[in-house]
Amino acid sequence: MNPNQKIITIGSVSLTIATICFLMQIAILVTTVTLHFKQYECDSPANNQVMPCEPIIIERNITEIVYLTNTTIEKEICPKLVEYRNWSKPQCKITGFAPFSKDNSIRLSAGGDIWVTREPYVSCDPGKCYQFALGQGTTLDNKHSNDTIHDRTPHRTLLMNELGVPFHLGTRQVCIAWSSSSCHDGKAWLHVCVTGYDKNATASFIYDGRLVDSIGSWSQNILRTQESECVCINGTCTVVMTDGSASGRADTKILFIEEGKIVHTSPLSGSAQHVEECSCYPRYPGVRCICRDNWKGSNRPVVDINVKDYSIDSSYVCSGLVGDTPRNNDRSSSSYCRNPNNEKGTHGVKGWAFDDGNDVWMGRTISEDSRSGYETFKVIGGWSTPNSKLQINRQVIVDSDNRSGYSGIFSVEGKSCINRCFYVELIRGREQETRVWWTSNSIVVFCGTSGTYGTGSWPDGADINLMPI
């Protein structure tokens, strides 16, 4: 090869290499520009349209680092669209209930700063469960805990902690309340908080940490609400509220709330005579509540709420094994689905039940006359057959020698079905335990299971003689 040919060959190779390098630089530039603009766009899986990221609620700010030769590009991954909960999955098929959580608040109060509380409940957002309670504005080892048996004071606040975390001094006080309900619509928490004078109380509606709406007492006689979770379906949350006599005719209303704003109010209709402290659960496309009749019945009222047209119906649980306390013994108790049974109807306790086809799962105190012990069972035909009494799958949650209290339901959405869970309030202190001057509680929580399970008893467990007076 002569010198001229060598020069031409070297030049051709150099030109080829230069061209390749030029094309690579163009590719890097195009990639950089594309990724820069795509960080502001998300593909919508519904219709393949491009949607801006900014209006979407970002739960986690994730950054992916992409390396191309010597160029570093930061690409923001668009978060999953947060949607309202619709609770359209079927209810889980269960054989009974398994232990889930216990906070041991009273035992811990013997040596730590734990809030004095009552009226606890549990509710979950799409990713985590929380426990709530109405605090008394004091810790247990504090002279302000004297005489905390009283239900309604201006110092009571709604407390919120992750489930299983006792209400310590760092606990968040969500709102001022001596009666409350809370629920998560898929986007944010709604808290319904009642406080004020007995004859002129106020219910505040707090959504996503902001006060959005309020309503005053309509019967001037202790406006009150559920003391357990409300339910939201497709952005509409329902809460049952009562104002009026605790031992006679009262005025119950069902409020429909969207992002904290009251959009409709429906009066109670149907055959229920007295409704308080409802334990509600989603029953798509509506909401179903099992409540307390504090006037005429030891059988529990049922309130069915139509979220679409705001209509209400009510009746009573058909099971002849009734759920309230006090009540007749199981041989003489009765319920015929439509009306209160007029059996030891005065007084009562918050409780729960839920339908399972024609059957009903329910919980109640073991004692027929006091808030002692706690049991659950299934009544065959208990949802559809008047005075049905065939009981199966009975479990003892708290033995009859130990105190219980309020109980309520909450729902947890799984991958394929909606599970029902319940909590039991374990009251300690006054009135029964007069060595101390305070009244407070801990909780135990169980959830439905399709598996097998054993036996036990899960009382509060604190030795009252070791507790601060």
UniProtKB/Swiss-Prot annotation:
Q: Which enzyme class, named as a word? A: hydrolase
From the Swiss-Prot or TrEMBL record, what is one GO molecular function term? exo-alpha-sialidase activity
User: Where, in residue ranges, is this chain on the Intravirion side?
Assistant: 1-9
Q: Name one GO biological process term.
A: viral budding from plasma membrane
State the residue spans of region: Head of neuraminidase.
Answer: 91-469
Q: Which stretches of sequence are listed as region Involved in apical transport and lipid raft association? A: 11-33
Can you name a GO cellular component term?
virion membrane
- Gene3D superfamilies in alphabetical order: 2.120.10.10
Q: Which regions of this chain are Virion surface-facing, per the record's topological domains? A: 31-469
Q: Name one Pfam family in it.
A: Neur
Q: Which cysteines are joined by disulfide bonds?
A: 92-417, 124-129, 183-230, 232-237, 278-291, 280-289, 318-337, 421-447
* UniProt-annotated binding residues for Ca(2+): 293, 297, 324
Instruction: State where it is primarily located.
Output: virion
The way this protein sits in the membrane is described as:
Single-pass type II membrane protein
The compartments listed are: Virion membrane; Host apical cell membrane
TM ranges are: 10-30
Which residues of this chain are annotated as glycosylation sites? Answer: 61, 70, 86, 146, 200, 234, 402
Q: Where is this region: Hypervariable stalk region?
A: 36-88
Q: Which cofactor does it need?
A: Ca(2+)
What domain comment accompanies this record? Intact N-terminus is essential for virion morphogenesis. Possesses two apical sorting signals, one in the ectodomain, which is likely to be a glycan, and the other in the transmembrane domain. The transmembrane domain also plays a role in lipid raft association.
Q: Which HAMAP family match?
A: INFV_NRAM
What exactly does this protein do?
Catalyzes the removal of terminal sialic acid residues from viral and cellular glycoconjugates. Cleaves off the terminal sialic acids on the glycosylated HA during virus budding to facilitate virus release. Additionally helps virus spread through the circulation by further removing sialic acids from the cell surface. These cleavages prevent self-aggregation and ensure the efficient spread of the progeny virus from cell to cell. Otherwise, infection would be limited to one round of replication.
Name of the molecule in the record = Neuraminidase
State the species of origin.
Answer: Influenza A virus (strain A/Memphis/110/1976 H3N2)
- Which gene is this protein's source? NA
